[in-house]
Amino acid sequence: MKSKILLIGIDGLNLDTGLENAPTLVALKEKGFFTPITIEPPTWSGPSWSTILTGAKHSQHGVFDNSFTGHKLLHHPDLLSRAYYQDQSTTTFAAAGWPPLVDPIGHGPIIHERREQAKALRHRVLVRDGETYGYTHVDAEIAAAAQYAISHHGPDVSFVYFCGVDEAGHAFGSIGDEYRGAIARIDAYLDNLLQAVQARASQEEPWLVVVTTDHGHIDEGGHGGDSAKERASFVVAHGVGRKNPLWPQSFEPHQLVDLLLAERA
């Protein structure tokens, strides 16, 4: 049976700051595959997530900031779309509170709309607006919807995104209690999602749970530059009901998509 893939994006996570507040992520890191990766500058969410989710470099997808001006994303399908094109029995799910990732109205989206598959219930998308309503509230909605989707639909390939950590980093810096508290909150959501995956895996469904981030933060909060802290990212991958992936110990952010698709081949 093909592995089901759950890719979780935690925006703006400094791994060296928050691990003591993230027991679920620590456990995944210790039991699974782990490697640090280095983000191509500029370290904004737009270009970084475009690269991570499509496998195209900045110069290819044309996203260089969060305005998405002049982007070429239509020519670079995302992970979920490519998984479907690879096998048209594939079901996909995406949930995010940062609209450019999933909202067809406005900037982007990085995750293609795929209306025909959506009508056929093969592609489900939850769009929320954390920029307007705040990510503390929106991330909770995203987590609940993703847990429901995993438990009741078991999509073959999913992308679930949280931005509360990044929001706290901008507002309070990345070394204070507020940032650590946001990490703890997202880690609790991660635990809920993992429990849903484990329940599915107990029915002989193999799952691969992958966690990554798009950039780090400087201590006082902020990113966009080319410092080591801003460019620091990672990939954690843990097999549930299957072995951990045999991936190279060093790779570039744009190579993650192909590694994930190979797990579905």
Regions found by a protein language model. Name each.
Residues 1-265:
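Feature captures the catalytic ectodomains and active-site-proximal regions of enzymes
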